[in-house]
Amino acid sequence: MLYLMSTTVIPHGADGTWMMITVSTDQAREIARDEHVSAVGHQSSADAMSAVLGITVAANRLTVKPEPGDEFLCLRLRRRPPEGVVLNLQQLEAIGFSWALLRYDG
């Protein structure tokens, strides 16, 4: 399964082997076209990801329990936002971000 996430934090209890590669925005758009489940917890993050990826990303506070072979397309901020701040697309772009593809091998 492919999950969309707004963080690269590994879910609790998902010990094992993980692989992470940085992907370009164009690659992220291509990957996001595949069937996926959104695990993006905040509407503002979902809206920003929707704008950048060119697809609808739903806000969905989901606890993910990875299975071997699952992949995660993750938004990676270049630095932490200020405490309690919910970022819009312009603020996200000002901070800077990249994309990572994580794979869980169990």
Question: What would you call each of these model-derived segments?
Answer:
Residues M1-D15:
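Short, extreme N-terminal segment that most often corresponds to the first beta-strand
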Residues M5-S6, M19, L53:
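Generic short amphipathic/hydrophobic targeting helices enriched at N-termini
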Residues G16-V37, E83-Q90, I95:
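The transition from N-terminal targeting/processing segments to the mature protein
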Residues T17-M20, A58, L73, A100:
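Intrinsically disordered, low-complexity, compositionally biased regions/tails
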Residues D34, S38-P81:
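Acidic, low-complexity, intrinsically disordered interaction modules
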Residues K65-G106:
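Polybasic, proline/glycine-rich intrinsically disordered low-complexity segments
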